[in-house]
Amino acid sequence: MSKTPADNHTPMMRQYFGLKSQHPNQLLFYRMGDFYELFYDDAKRASRLLDITLTARGHSGGIPIPMAGIPYHAAENYIARLVRMGESVVVAEQTGDPATSKGPVERQIARIVTPGTISDEAFLEEKRENLLLSLAHQSRKGLDIFGFSYLDMASGRFCLFEVDGHEALSSELQRLSPREILISEDFPARATLKLEKGISELGPWHFDYESSYRQLIQQFSTKDLSGFGCEAMTAAIASAGALLQYAKDTQRSALPHIQSIMVEHKDDSVLIDGATRRNLEIDINLTGGTSNTLVEVLDKCSTPMGSRLLKRWLHTPIRDLNEIQARQQVVAELQQNQSYNAFEAPLKKVGDLERILSRVALRSARPRDLLRLRFALEAAPEINGLLANATSERLQELNLRILAQPIITETLAKALVENPPSVVRDGGIFAKGYDEELDELLALSTNATDFLAEMERSEKARTGISSLKVGFNRVHGYYIEISRLHSDQAPVEYIRRQTLKNAERFITPELKAFEDKALSAKSKSLAREKELYEALLEQLNEILGELQTTSQALAQLDVLNNFAERANALSFTCPELHNRGGIQIVGGRHPVVESVISEPFVPNDLDLNDKRSLLMITGPNMGGKSTYMRQIALITLLAHTGCFVPAESASISVVDRIFTRMGSSDDLAGGRSTFMVEMTETANILNNASKNSLVLMDEVGRGTSTFDGLSLAWAAVDYLANKLKCYVLFATHYFELTTLADQLENAANVHLTATEYEDEIVFLHKVHEGPASQSYGLQVAQLAGVPRDVIGHAKQKLKELEVVTGIDLDTKTIETKANSSSIKAKTKEHLVKESKNGYQPQQVDMFAQAEQNALKNALEELDLDNMTPLEAISALYKLKSQL
């Protein structure tokens, strides 16, 4: 940006700087005739992002002005691209008349487009919510409290809640996946956001609690916020006030479609942290795509708003038994006789009613939006008829909330043409007969074609010039065109209007008089259409609340109808949810895996209860341990949404959280190793799980040395079983841990089976009681394509190591010989006792001490850091011979 005094700039550039100073961090589209121009740093940024030409427009203040421009008729495409990149755009339109302006044409900010406040259909992803999130921070009693508020501008859904701690902050950010985040300039957890784009920093005063409180009660026309249940959430209120003002500023509207605020309570839902969302691949797979996810399998909704609601339900499973059972009853009723099929066609007519109503409220709805609104309203009575004999209470409630609107539906049917234009300014919106004044004005424009044809015929006859044509263009208006060859034959009353390469264009007094009349009629008809259109929007806004109620009910019906269709198509059954404790599943399946594999999926059972709350899972790699664990979590999650589940039967006690620690990778940006990520996730589980939590842990301790990893895994299992007493599936390759089932009252071993056939491993994927007897590591390596020479060498080394460590090759079991120093032999007396603090593990001697001092001394003298593997093997043989 130029630093020269304002007086050194041209009047137009001074006008530009005045507008730009109001929005220094956003790209300013400055309308100049048929183009939007960007200057200085904005031009450079837009050139880089949009791959458009960067040029210069003269000088201002003695400095060349970098400039980039785009045609105004293509602006929406460019703005959409910028918004998808996380940029915000300010559009300045010409509001003055260039013909009468003495200085630069007057310009004003017409709209502000930011990633989180868009409502235009062209900018939105159909099946993804577009959330604007606001965060405020407070310190209370040594805790970091983060106030969340978020708004879906395209639907008017406005929510708030609070969490404490950076881990919860990160988890909620992943759940909501906002397009834009508002924070104060002094926000202390900026690094946790992990975003480069889509963050808007505001002055700290925007998050002032008192002004935010006033902002909210003014919006909802209430005396206070006690009716919303958020009076004590001061951080959340501060964030919500800042968000609401920001949304009003960008939309230049009072936001009439935002009529309430919903408070989210932690105890209402099953909490799922960020690691669990990743591992369960709810809507994003582990590689960042959307294929082979739970949503891809489940989402066969008929409306986009149903698809978005389904995703919300999956990300926020509920704990209210009454609500869960109400949903189940609807699914069961719709599943009977496949009655869900009858709803598919009328629901498809509804379309994205939710977002259409948002644009109606913001006065940005386009003519085709109103046509789709008409189709949606015409479907309502049909859906009411299908629900008339519903027996479940929830379906009866939904039927009452789906309100037919016969008056406005008839108005829309009479008003709109069958194929309205995409924008109001083009005209041609209203059907003939809707408005008498408009019909008269349109008749003048329509008659122009007949008039021009008749004039062309008569002038040809009068002048004898066969090449004469009568036409119209937007720049020069109406004209008579004669080829250059015959232009000298033009009558004297023809007035030359334009010279072309091969022709001359003329005007006559008669044609000029008609032009004035026709153009005036066109201008008046467009003005009348705009007037009628605004009146129609006003009429719709008078019943906006009722229309939103209908929209919400239709979205719920769509999701529940989808659940019924999926239950029938995928052989899902209704689970029993209760508060008695325990999780029992018969014939459970993984809903995503079974949809992508060609062979039949092998179902498995689960039995967790107070006396058997922890399962130690062993078995070969690729044997199905992770799939088994994930399917249990997904079945549990689905059950808490009211959806039927992939199992023969399921009885599930309501859980408060679902945790997973399954696989890790380096967090390079955060400077954390794989093991550090693993331990952070483990710590989160151990610190936050309760007796009613479901915990899935896979390969804890594998990222460090064997003894360190084994010790950590051992201690974690002990803590989960004795202190937390939650429901745990713990998969491991540390076979020493299987001895814990003999020592912990509430632990048991299960394993995934495999067998060898003609030197090849066959995975049976079936869960059986007891620990695994073999790991099949070399066979899996061979399947992976490891060279035969390497496999052969590994087998040789395995035999040497088995001799050293005392593993029996004949039986191929992991049991150690009687005289070996195994963990199992030294931990039979392991006991856990309750202390005053509730948990104190008794010290266990996991690693046997040498029985002879000489052997101990020999071990201590070994310089392990400087020994080769062969030297180490040789030393071990020598030591073994001394036993």
Curated annotation (Swiss-Prot):
Report the superkingdom from the record.
Answer: Bacteria
What keywords were assigned to this record? ATP-binding, DNA damage, DNA repair, DNA-binding, Nucleotide-binding
| A Pfam family that the UniProt record links to this protein | MutS_I
Looking up PROSITE patterns in the UniProt record yields:
DNA_MISMATCH_REPAIR_2
Q: What's any one GO cellular component for it?
A: cytosol
Alphabetically, which GO biological process terms does the record hold? mismatch repair
- Kindly give the SUPFAM superfamilies that the UniProt entry links to this protein: DNA repair protein MutS, domain I (SSF55271), DNA repair protein MutS, domain II (SSF53150), DNA repair protein MutS, domain III (SSF48334), P-loop containing nucleoside triphosphate hydrolases (SSF52540)
Gene3D superfamilies assigned? 1.10.1420.10, 6.10.140.430, DNA repair protein MutS, domain I (3.40.1170.10), MutS, connector domain (3.30.420.110), P-loop containing nucleotide triphosphate hydrolases (3.40.50.300)
Annotated membrane-spanning segments are: none
**Would the keyword Iron be found if you checked this record's keyword annotation?**
no
Recall the GO molecular function terms of this protein's record: ATP binding; ATP-dependent DNA damage sensor activity; damaged DNA binding; mismatched DNA binding
Which residues are ATP-binding? G619, P620, N621, M622, G623, G624, K625, S626
| InterPro entries cross-referenced by the UniProt entry | DNA_mismatch_repair_MutS, DNA_mismatch_repair_MutS-lik_N, DNA_mismatch_repair_MutS/MSH, DNA_mismatch_repair_MutS_C, DNA_mismatch_repair_MutS_clamp, DNA_mismatch_repair_MutS_core, DNA_mismatch_repair_MutS_N, DNA_mismatch_repair_MutS_sf
Q: What does this protein do?
A: This protein is involved in the repair of mismatches in DNA. It is possible that it carries out the mismatch recognition step. This protein has a weak ATPase activity.
Q: Which PANTHER family has this protein been placed in?
A: DNA MISMATCH REPAIR PROTEIN MSH1, MITOCHONDRIAL, DNA MISMATCH REPAIR PROTEIN MUTS FAMILY MEMBER
What's this protein's family per the entry?
Belongs to the DNA mismatch repair MutS family.
UniProt-listed NCBIfam families = mutS1, PRK05399.1
Name the chain's protein: DNA mismatch repair protein MutS
Q: Which organism is it from?
A: Marinomonas sp. (strain MWYL1)
Q: What is the lineage of its organism?
A: Bacteria, Pseudomonadati, Pseudomonadota, Gammaproteobacteria, Oceanospirillales
